Design a protein with these regions (language model features):
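C-terminal, non-catalytic interaction/recognition modules in large multi-subunit enzymes and RNPs
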Residues: 1-399
């Protein structure tokens, strides 16, 4: 106990060997556990060594670190939530995003959530830039479920929290999306089979400031549904689950802050970008073997889903290819609720592409980089407000 060894060194045990690399130390703590520490934890940000080219081992370590943070977020959300929907059905997702709202890593949660949450984060950034939302501060959390700005359907509420690392602007974002049991509307459960407008389906939120300086803004929250004809039927449970999402996001902040403190913000951002670039390369290898094709499907109500898929040169990178998915020919948005928001359409495409990959990579924004979606505004895969969307979201998620 108390013994300390500086790397490089090799520690032989009865059942294996431990490699202590240069820059690391190994010590035995009071519990007789071997603790490995990197010297970078003793540096200030200015003193940290210059970044080295990222190798596959370092990239894999960071990939698992990012995913572990998202998993910790999910576990805290499960443990602190109140509703059966989140606590037992596990209808929630947690993820990390870069400063631009690009998905970096996630826990293996709900695909339609994970592929669309980035749209919600980017919508928040756009509204901040347009002064439609106050400048973000440490301790903020905002809520959004708007299907026309990154949401899926109204019961899925996303809590978005910026992560600051000493600068004026967020360095990262963490977000959690949960399916809430009821958000008001004409039917209990907020999934009416006969809705014809988004107003029928419940509470609509777009970047509502829910937490400021770590305190719940109850006045903002209560004002958001005060004028609704049919308000949420169990507001106490809804509020409790939203507070659980805030707690989950706090777990994500803590994980990222510890990682930045240990490794430095520059290296963390470099590894996030590297993870996305690697995913993009994997998708490019996939599409290089695909052929042009088209498909059309008639639904029970006579509506048409049409798609043409083509591999074309990338205009921004002439030596690379991109996969174009053209949904022109798809029927106009329906009078009922079989309309899938563009964020759902995007999430479905992203998940299908991820399933086709042989590479073991997390779903992230890089998977979408070599893709181009052409979805006409006003069709049933990209409806305009105030279209009803609850059935389109469900059918798209199950497709």
């Amino acid at each position: 106990i108390g013994c300390c060894i500086e790397g490089p060194a090799l520690i032989a045990e009865a059942t294996g060997c431990i490699v202590v690399e240069d820059g690391w130390t190994a010590r035995v703590d009071r519990a007789a556990a071997l603790v490995l520490e990197h010297e970078s934890i003793f540096f200030t940000e200015a003193e940290k060594p210059a970044l080295k080219p990222a190798g596959p081992v370092l990239a894999e370590l960071f990939r698992h670190r990012f995913m572990a943070i998202a998993e910790q977020m999910g576990e805290r959300l499960r443990q602190t939530s109140r509703s059966v929907n989140i606590r037992e059905r596990l209808d929630f997702s947690c993820a990390l995003f870069d400063s631009h709202g690009g998905l970096v890593a996630n826990a293996p949660h709900i695909p339609v959530h994970l592929g669309s949450m980035g749209d919600s984060v980017r919508d928040l950034l756009e509204q901040v830039a347009a002064d439609a939302v106050p400048p973000l501060q440490p301790g903020d959390t905002l809520l959004s479920n708007d299907p026309f700005h990154g949401g899926t359907h109204l019961p899925d509420i996303t809590a978005i929290t910026p992560v600051f690392c000493g600068g004026l602007n967020p360095s990262f974002f963490v977000a959690s999306r949960g399916h809430h049991a009821d958000v008001g509307g004409i039917s209990p459960g907020s999934m009416p089979s006969f809705s014809t407008s988004i107003d029928d389906e419940g509470l609509l939120l777009r970047n509502l400031l829910f937490v400021r300086d770590g305190a719940i803004q109850l006045s903002n929250w209560e004002a958001s549904f005060r004028e609704m004809a049919i308000q949420p039927r169990n507001p106490q449970e809804l509020l409790a689950d939203l507070q659980a999402q805030v707690a989950a996001n706090q777990a994500g902040i803590e994980g990222l802050e510890q990682l930045v403190e240990r490794e430095g913000e520059a290296l963390v951002q470099q590894q996030m970008q590297g993870l996305q670039l690697h995913a993009a390369d994997c998708v490019r290898r996939l599409i290089s073997g695909l052929a042009d094709m088209s498909h059309q499907l008639q639904l029970d109500d006579g509506a048409i889903l049409a798609v043409r898929i083509g591999v074309l040169p990338d205009q921004q990178n002439s030596d690379q290819q991109k996969l174009v998915l053209d949904f022109r020919g798809t029927s106009q948005q329906r009078q009922g609720n079989f309309n899938a928001p563009l964020s759902v359409t995007r999430a479905v495409v992203l998940y299908v592409i991820r399933c086709l990959l042989d590479d073991d990579i997390p779903l992230n924004e890089g998977c979408f980089a070599p893709l181009e979606l052409r979805v006409p505004l006003g069709c049933m895969l990209n409806p305009e407000a105030p279209a009803a969307v609850v059935a389109g979201n469900v059918e798209g998620s199950q497709a």
